[in-house]
């Protein structure tokens, strides 16, 4: 089986979505019957994270434009490689060319619209909902997010699976003072 992972989040600033993808796929790489294709601009960065193995492949993205990437580049890559499944965060390509796994981490822009521009809310409500409804496998990270997806997008509860956020192994056992210092935290709410 060939599985493409949209790893473009590894090209930008560090965020929770990156930790989620890294946690899932570093553990899945041991499944040698799956060929993993990680797609991003910075292939060297991905190589440093996921390493080298016979079932690990890297695909360099050429476009930095999200619309071009989702409307043109991914459908072409998926077709060229003969990908069986592709995993996207929030928004899948406009043209469906394989089975899709979509993770929607949250819908904060719908839960708290006052903190988001109207254009962002309208665009993402349409794209997230379309991606969620078309997904062959729809994932989210918590019961709260699952309930919000059901409420906002009217998607059957049975179609949504929870894959909780986790802590990366390298962060396990870090002393609390080190964590507080790295976060610049002086308050006592972390104990």
Regions flagged by a language model, labelled:
Residues 1-191:
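Carbohydrate transferase catalytic cores enriched for Leloir-type hexosyltransferases
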């Amino acid at each position: 089986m060939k599985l493409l992972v949209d790893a473009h989040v590894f090209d930008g600033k560090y965020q929770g979505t990156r930790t989620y993808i890294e946690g899932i796929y570093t553990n899945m790489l041991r499944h040698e019957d799956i060929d993993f294709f990680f797609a991003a601009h910075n292939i060297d960065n991905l190589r440093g994270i996921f390493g080298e193995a016979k079932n690990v492949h890297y695909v360099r993205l050429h476009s930095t434009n999200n619309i071009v990437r989702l409307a043109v580049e991914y459908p072409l890559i998926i077709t060229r490689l003969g990908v069986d499944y592709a995993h996207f965060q929030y928004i899948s390509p406009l043209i469906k060319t394989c089975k899709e796994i979509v993770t929607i981490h949250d819908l904060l822009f719908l839960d708290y619209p006052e903190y988001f521009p109207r254009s962002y809310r309208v665009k993402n409500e349409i794209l997230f909902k379309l991606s969620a409804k078309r997904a062959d496998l729809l994932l989210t990270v918590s019961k709260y997010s699952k309930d919000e997806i059901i409420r906002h997008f009217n998607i059957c509860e049975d179609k949504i699976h929870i894959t909780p956020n986790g802590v990366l192994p390298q962060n396990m056992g870090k002393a609390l003072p080190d964590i507080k210092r790295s976060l610049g935290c002086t308050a006592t709410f972390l104990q």
